[in-house]
Amino acid sequence: MDVAVVILYSRDDALDLLYRTLHYWWKRSDGLRGQIYVVSNTNVLLPRYAKLIQQKRKGVGGARCDAIESTSEDYIIFSDGHVTPPREISKMLVEPWSSVPINHIILPFGTSGRVAYSLPFMPDERQFLWCSCSKYKEEITTTGEPIVAMSRKYISMSKCYTSYGLDLFQFTLRMPPGQLIGDEGIHFIEAKKLISNRKPNKDEMKDFYDTIYIKRKSEIEEEIKECFCRAL
């Protein structure tokens, strides 16, 4: 099983960070039957073991779509932690505020442009994931950013972030009174875009790091390790 390691790079990012990330993944992927790619919106000089994918679509989600379209490996490991089979393409496109099964909600590009779904997190909790999506149905991916684990005591949340914290959304879970959020049954979610293209302030980024990133980091490392083991 081949694995592609994809690094997302923007002209606004520090170049030395890109090279450190490349070196890190080059060492981590020793013996991996795959290729390291860099998706970038600018031309950048890369070492011989990495290939450049020119970014055509806008945003982080657009870069992910470009990576999925341009690679043929069985699995893609995004350098920010996502491990996904690139051919798992969602087929459902819905209007804003539509209610659909919680593991299949896609908000139209331009209006909201995000996809959200859930994975089991705790016996009485679910973890909501999301990402940018493209305007075309067949190009929507199921990779996502971790948002937060929602306790059974709450039915809504108002803070969530992309990789770079560019948007804020509100997700509201609807379910029968007294029913727990679990693996059984079908739950529904509504989504509304609150603020567009606003970078979070320092307090919001600290909140994101303290409450989401730290909790998710160990899980990401386990996913990457497992994917490497399958590929060897």
UniProtKB/Swiss-Prot annotation:
CDD domains: Glyco_tranf_GTA_type. It comes from the Viruses. InterPro entries: Nucleotide-diphossugar_trans. This is Uncharacterized 26.8 kDa protein. It comes from Thermoproteus tenax virus 1 (strain KRA1) (TTV1). The lineage of its organism: Viruses, Adnaviria, Zilligvirae, Taleaviricota, Tokiviricetes.
